[in-house]
């Protein structure tokens, strides 16, 4: 059984109330970007798994942009973003170099 968290008290100071409002907005924006990042990476990996070279290249180009945006905003560390881009790039390049499958 899940236990409900005790409700937090509202801040008394105006600056504290403003901080709560700002944090809520930032949390929503960060969650949205994080989701977009994961979706972009997942789409590239699906295209690679399907063996679709052109689609994988196009999706990888879009994913790179999203990964850079997320790293610049500090949602994910820049080294994690670089590592993910590198791994995706290696998968796309391996797909491009692989001989075409007989259909």
UniProtKB/Swiss-Prot annotation:
Listed GO MF terms: small ribosomal subunit rRNA binding; structural constituent of ribosome
Pfam family for this entry, one: Ribosomal_S20p
Function: Binds directly to 16S ribosomal RNA.
UniProt xrefs under HAMAP family: Ribosomal_bS20
Biased composition (Basic residues): 1-20
Annotated spans, Disordered: 1-31
Species of the source: Polaromonas sp. (strain JS666 / ATCC BAA-500)
Family matches, as PANTHER family: 30S RIBOSOMAL PROTEIN S20, SMALL RIBOSOMAL SUBUNIT PROTEIN BS20C
Name of the protein described by the UniProt record: Small ribosomal subunit protein bS20
Keyword hit for NAD: no
Entries under SUPFAM superfamilies matching the protein: Ribosomal protein S20 (SSF46992)
Key word Ribosomal protein present: yes
């Amino acid at each position: 059984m899940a236990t409900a968290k005790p409700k937090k008290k509202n801040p008394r100071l105006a600056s504290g109330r403003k901080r709560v409002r700002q944090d809520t907005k930032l949390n929503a924006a960060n969650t949205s970007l994080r989701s977009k990042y994961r979706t972009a990476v997942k789409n590239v990996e699906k295209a690679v798994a399907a063996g679709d070279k052109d689609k994988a290249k196009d999706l990888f180009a879009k994913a790179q942009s999203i990964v850079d945006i997320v790293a610049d905003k500090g949602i994910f560390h820049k080294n994690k973003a670089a590592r993910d881009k590198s791994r995706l790039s290696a998968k796309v390049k391996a797909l491009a170099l692989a001989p075409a499958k007989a259909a």
